[in-house]
Amino acid sequence: VKYYFNKDFEITNMVESFLTAKDEFDDDIILSYSDILFSQKMLRTMMNSDEDFSVAVDVDWKKYWQMRYGKVDFDTESLKVNDKGYITSLGLENPPVDEIDARYVGLLKFSKKALMDILDIWNADYEEYQDKPWQQSGKTIRKAYMTDLLNALIKKGRYVKAVSFEGG
């Protein structure tokens, strides 16, 4: 496990923090939010994914969300999945509950090829979106959420696989 420090953490967000480790993008990587817990089985499943972009999602989210927040119809980590298991949209604020297939967990796997795609998209958009919204969150590119990055990948035609778990 390697740790990286984003010296600009106070004026940026998670994607820019993630990209401080770009010198390590020479093989597949697992990326995890620092505030989540997951089982070894979940980690192994993610590690064994053959997809370029793999995202752990919780398909059994409603009970937990109701308990935690008292409602289930808000958030920016909701997502929709097509019949082949690929995410078609995510990060929409307050989507209709019947349009939520799962919730984003914060555990991802990117192949080496995927990492190069991420850098290409990031570098192409970086200057243009310094002072205007980049994706659905309305944040500038330096303050982008990981869901913004995933949404950018989907918009650019990349296939982002939802790796489903019950609980997450």
PLM feature spans:
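Short loop/edge segments at beta-strand edges and connector loops
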Residues: 5-7, 33, 57
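Alpha-helical elements of Rossmann-like donor-binding domains used by nucleotide-donor carbohydrate transfer enzymes
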Residues: 20, 45, 148-149
